[in-house]
Regions:
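Metal-dependent catalytic neighborhoods of phosphoester/phosphodiester hydrolases
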Residues: 79-80, 114-124, 261-262
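Conserved beta-strand hairpin/beta-sheet module of binuclear metal-dependent hydrolase folds
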Residues: 2-92, 194-207
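Cap/insert and terminal regions of metallo-dependent hydrolase folds
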Residues: 80, 198-275
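Metallo-beta-lactamase
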Residues: 84-95, 99-111, 126-184, 230-246
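Active-site glycine- and acidic-residue-rich loops that bind
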Residues: 112, 181-194
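Residue-level marker for buried hydrophobic side chains located in beta-strands
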Residues: 67-69, 104, 130, 201-203, ...
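Catalytic metal-binding/acid-base residues of hydrolase active sites
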Residues: 72-74, 109, 136, 186, ...
Length: 275
């Protein structure tokens, strides 16, 4: 499954790695009435008792380079058996994984970087330079840090640290690819990045990962955030910027293909798909 589109003059494509089955809503969106969460999900046409999300990987053709942003779960099935489709969908779209020049990571959680390495220990994108935040690499590269979750730490050891010589760290506001600027958006992880793309779009990563709950309840502490209070503040900053600057949203976990915009709605926000 893939979807071609343009961001200004930049050719883009969304490529699916397939859906994930996450925890029950009240276990993720903390401090929100479970009944309110269920009602919001039902109103959105989603199942009320489980968080189901997509994995929409962005491919850009920019400045003679082919850049892939995040790469899904790989072959791991801890969030269900329907993920791990990225490589097959790339080939269906006519994209050879060996043609990827830049592998760009919003952060190092399982569903964003476990497609980096194959089960045999060889890179799935053998010619790619890996770009990620310096703060993210420092955080996950520090063994024994009690703030790390064990599953993500194991994944970093398998998928990223063996390729350390290919990793280039990037900083907030750095334009590291033609038409692409990094935006440090901490909270979900210490070095989480969003990306601003010339032509008026923002790849938001996991700052506001769920449509509609992240928009209706931006102040809710998220169980997946390393620093939940920082995550709340970052989410408010991001959502206000998306609205004020009228940026198009590229949502990694949003309903396929994850494209739309954000508007203010009552005392919170809402995502308008396809706009």
């Amino acid at each position: 499954m893939f979807h071609r589109f343009m961001i200004g003059d930049i050719a883009a494509m969304m490529i699916s790695d397939g859906p994930l089955r996450l925890a029950r809503p009240h276990r993720i969106f903390q401090s929100v009435d479970p009944a309110a969460l269920a009602d919001a999900l039902t109103h959105a046409g989603q199942v009320p008792d489980r968080i189901l999300v997509e994995q929409n990987c962005l491919l850009l053709e920019t400045g003679g380079k082919r850049a892939l942003f995040d790469n899904g779960m790989g072959t791991d099935t801890m969030f269900g058996t329907e993920s791990g489709r990225l490589l097959a969908n790339m080939r269906e779209a006519g994209v050879d994984p060996a043609s990827i020049d830049a592998l760009v990571l919003t952060h190092a959680h399982s569903d964003h970087c476990w497609g980096t390495m194959g089960d045999d220990g060889t890179p799935n994108f053998p010619n790619a330079t890996i770009y990620m935040a310096e703060a993210e690499l420092d955080f996950w590269g520090e063994a024994g840090n009690p703030a790390q979750d064990e599953i993500s730490q194991r994944g970093v050891q398998k998928h990223l640290l063996p390729l350390r010589e290919r990793i280039v760290t990037i900083r907030d506001r750095q334009s590291f690819l033609p038409g692409v600027q990094a935006w440090l958006t901490p909270g979900h992880t210490p070095g989480h990045l969003a990306f601003l793309i010339d032509g008026g779009a923002c790849l938001t990563g996991d700052v506001a990962f769920h449509d509609p709950l992240s928009y209706l309840y931006p102040e809710a502490r998220c169980a997946y955030d390393t620093e939940p209070e920082v995550g709340v503040e970052t989410r408010r900053i991001m959502l206000n910027r998306l609205v004020d600057e009228r940026l198009g949203v590229i949502g990694y976990h949003h309903p396929w293909p994850g494209l739309g915009r954000v508007e203010r709605f009552r005392d919170s926000y809402r995502f308008i798909a396809g706009a």
